[in-house]
Curated annotation (Swiss-Prot):
Its EC number is 3.1.11.-. Belongs to the 5'-3' exonuclease family. InterPro entries: 5_3_exoribonuclease, Xrn1_helical, Xrn1_N. One of its GO terms (molecular function) is 5'-3' RNA exonuclease activity. Keywords: Exonuclease, Hydrolase, Nuclease. Signal peptide: none annotated. It is an enzyme of class 3 (hydrolase). The lineage of its organism: Viruses, Varidnaviria, Bamfordvirae, Nucleocytoviricota, Megaviricetes. It holds the Pfam family XRN_N. GO terms for biological process: nuclear-transcribed mRNA catabolic process. This is Putative exonuclease 012L. Residues 161-180 are annotated as: Disordered. The keyword ATP-binding does not apply.
Length: 624
């Protein structure tokens, strides 16, 4: 999902950087086509099984039809854009901080699947109707293992013309895709595949698909090539912007499907960055360091939403969050991020005045929410408001200090712990998007973000009410000027230790931090281990026996009987926060170690291995 509403903001404010192209247009010169595969996989499953954007399933729907549709979509993009290199990446095991969000989504999917008309599955042999579990689109499942094999065979056949040939696809019924189906017709693509270099990272290669794509660009990027990344997540825009500052490439685009249309939308990232810089330069007195500004912009965008931290309550794109941050950024004229030679860090002394300016907007934003029926009711806002009379009649006005206090008391036992952990998370996200995974095991443990006041207090080294002497020495803060990002990349027991300053009892010297050496490097957990963490009991059959027993026995206590979704202050139902019991990772690890030795079938064991990236060239296959 990435940053909610960011693409809408981009279309509204920088439409000149977006071009609409139809599926017959092959005029766009692309040297390297990179595909974030999970979007194609989900769309294909929805089309075959008739859920999500599609009203009816295909006749005799089965997994093989999904695999075939995925490969046909790849074929058509190869034919249209004629790249020299094709990079295909499927989501592998994710960092712990992403697994928390994945767990929320999969419990929500299991909850929604109980509703009528969702995720149909027609048995190919018997014609019976059952449910298709979209949670099977997760690393380590039989569905994903078979898909990886299918794509592998498909690529090999394509590079050996004697084995090519495929069936045409059936047109879906009652769907917008009926408007133009000519782009789906079978064509001869032998020439396009014969000289094509293909790189394929399946679900056994750890890491999110989009980050594996960017890793490829960082390692093998060619400044003379034009790169195009296909996918719908706003993350891809941020990663592409980051590539302009961390690699030698100059031309990079993001391609995505146009909503309810057969066309594509092509985002010109260098053009977008150029116009963004132009807007800021007009209010910047000194010479603007463009690379630092790009990283600053990426950092600020993550404050309005990302997949690893809940967004700060009063900073939202739909309430001009990005515009406000840019205005305060140009007002203060201080760079937020810096590169110490080993990686990007953020300077809290530069960020602090921006947050203070944003804090000044909270009153009007809260008043807007409590008086606007477009938002779901927020009981905290309601209980903190009082009636006032003005020229518009009677309206509610929020006692902002009362609301801030109630918010923190409701959601956190210790506001200092939450604020400091959130700051750690901000550095984790910055490192993740500009370098690599800082720590696979780190995660933010709360469902909500602290409010701006609490974060500002923590950054100002003010003692927060209720903070004990023990807590002061336990929780950490980030360095001001430099940090060893190599240590971050190899952190194991604590990402906090690498980017930390212990709260001193006197709180006097804000630039005195302890740069602690880390002991061992953390790594991604095995796929079955992740499935135990993210799957609800209703999806236990996606794990082999006896691992599946853990979800319905030891781990069942962490699954709620009724799903609670907090939509307070949200505009849309899908924005709600899924509240789940906190899962004890030690218990999950114990279950994995307890049951894994009894998984003996080779077809199951192969799904739990750590894979390697394949390279296909001239009919030969090698490892990258």
């Amino acid at each position: 999902m990435g940053i909610k509403y960011f693409f809408k903001w981009l279309k509204t404010n920088h439409s000149e950087s977006i071009k609409c192209i139809d599926r017959h247009d092959n005029s766009q010169c692309i040297d390297v086509l990179l595909i974030d595969m999970n979007g194609i996989i989900h769309n294909s499953a929805q089309e075959v099984y008739g859920y999500g954007s599609f009203s009816f399933p295909k006749e005799n729907a089965c997994d093989k039809k999904v695999y075939s549709l995925v490969c046909r979509q790849i074929d058509r993009m190869v034919i249209q854009f004629k790249p020299k290199e094709l990079i295909l990446c499927i989501d592998g095991v994710a960092p712990r901080s992403k697994q928390i969000q994945q767990r929320q989504r999969r419990f929500l999917a299991a909850h929604d699947r109980k509703k009528p008309g969702t995720e149909f599955n027609f048995d190919c042999n018997k014609g019976n109707t059952s449910k298709f579990d979209s949670n099977s689109i997760s690393p380590g499942t039989e569905f994903m293992h078979n898909l990886g094999r299918y794509i592998d065979i498909h690529i090999k056949k394509k590079q050996k013309p004697a084995f090519t040939g495929r069936e045409t696809t059936d047109a879906p019924q009652n769907n917008w895709r009926n408007k133009d189906q000519s782009w789906r017709q079978k064509v001869d693509d032998t020439a396009e595949w014969s000289n094509l270099t293909v790189v394929f990272a399946n679900d056994k290669v750890s890491g999110e698909g989009e980050h594996k794509l960017l890793d490829y660009i960082r390692k093998y990027g060619n400044s003379y090539y034009t790169y195009c990344i296909y996918g719908s997540d706003a993350d891809l825009i941020m990663l592409s912007m980051s590539a302009l500052t961390t690699t030698a490439i100059k031309n990079i685009y993001v391609l995505r499907d146009e909503y309810k249309s057969p066309n594509y939308l092509l985002i010109n990232i260098p053009n977008f960055v150029k116009n963004l810089i132009k807007d800021v330069k007009s209010n910047w007195t000194d010479k603007l360091d463009e690379k630092r500004f790009i990283n600053d912009f990426i950092f600020m965008c993550f404050m309005v939403g990302n997949d690893f931290l809940p967004h700060i309550p009063s900073i939202e794109i739909m309430t001009n969050g990005i515009e406000s941050m840019l205005a305060f950024y140009t007002k203060n004229k201080n760079y937020i991020t810096d590169n110490n030679g080993l990686g990007e860090i953020f300077n809290y002394e530069s960020l602090l005045p921006i947050l203070k300016d944003l804090e000044g907007l909270e009153q009007s934003l809260c008043n807007e929410k409590v008086n606007n029926s477009e938002y779901f009711r927020d009981d905290l806002l309601e209980s903190s408001s009082f009636l006032v009379t003005n020229e518009f009649g009677q309206q509610k006005c929020v006692n902002i200090n009362e609301y801030r206090e109630k918010y923190m008391k409701k959601h956190f036992e210790s506001s200092s712990e939450a604020s400091l952990m959130y700051l750690e998370g901000m550095q984790w996200v910055l490192s993740y998007y500009t370098l690599k995974v800082p720590d696979w095991e780190w995660s933010y443990k709360y469902d909500y973000a602290p409010n701006l006041t609490s974060i500002i207090e923590a950054m100002s080294f003010k003692q927060i009410g209720g903070t004990s002497k023990k807590e002061k020495n336990q929780y950490k803060l980030f360095p001001v000027n430099s940090v060893n990002s190599t240590e971050v990349a190899t952190s194991s027991s604590g990402f906090q230790k690498s980017f930390s300053m212990v709260f001193q009892n006197s709180l006097q010297n804000t630039k005195d931090w302890r740069d602690k050496k880390t002991k061992t490097s953390s790594d991604a957990i095995p796929p079955f281990h992740q499935l135990l963490f993210i799957l609800p009991p209703d999806s236990s059959d996606l794990l082999p026996y006896p691992l599946c027993e853990a979800l319905t026995n030891e781990l069942k206590i962490y699954a709620p009987k009724e799903l609670i979704i907090d939509r307070a202050g949200k505009r849309q139902e899908w924005e709600g926060i899924v509240l789940l019991p906190k899962l004890d990772q030690k218990v999950v690890t114990e279950c994995y170690l307890k049951y894994k030795p009894y998984v003996t079938e080779k077809k199951d064991l192969i799904r739990d291995i750590k894979g390697r990236t394949f390279k296909y060239q001239n009919g030969e296959v090698s490892f990258l």
